[in-house]
Amino acid sequence: TATASGVAYYDLPTLRQELADADLITLLIGSNDTVLQLMGAMGRATNGKATKLLIPLLTGTMRELNLQTLQTLRKGLENLDLTPEELKAALKLLDSGMEEICDQTRDQTVANVEQILQELRALNPDAQIILVGYYNPLPFLPTYGRHFRLLNRSVKALAQQYGADYVSIPYTSIANDGHPTVCGHKYIARQILKAVRK
């Protein structure tokens, strides 16, 4: 890895050689794919007005499905000054449209992970590959719970298919921005270390 103007970049031939020579490869990818698709869809549905609503959704202000969360969501929608069409589109997205986005994104994420596992195995058939699963960054959204359960099931099957070790991380402690806390990172590290072959 090198940097140019503070931006990290990778020299692909060097990276490929390092992967070919590695004894252990850990892989944790695709976690943001669904969140980014949801943000884009909500922005399109509300002509860009939904940013004010997405911030509390994605920063963890609304972590649980309770009265306070529903009131915050309702107030957030009211404060967006949406047209009736935009409100209808936003509510449809939060109701049933998100499931379609999750299904499409999950299929693409699984395909991407499979392609990466194929390439890693071609480069290094003998390395231990540890494929880390996913935690749910938005636990109050039932669609996301289903999405991440199915995604973990699919990725675990891929790990078995390509001779990788799957590591589950469902109890990751999450910060307000949806990313693991320091304790969450330590938990993930402990789960990975348990899977490392001696």
Task: Kindly give the residue locations of the regions a language model identified.
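Conserved SGNH/GDSL esterase-like catalytic core that processes O-acyl groups on lipids
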Residues: 1-99, 103-104
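Structural recognition of the beta-strand scaffold that forms the well-ordered cores
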Residues: 23-28, 128-133, 165-168
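Histidine-centered active-site loop/cap adjacent to the catalytic His
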Residues: 23, 156, 176-198
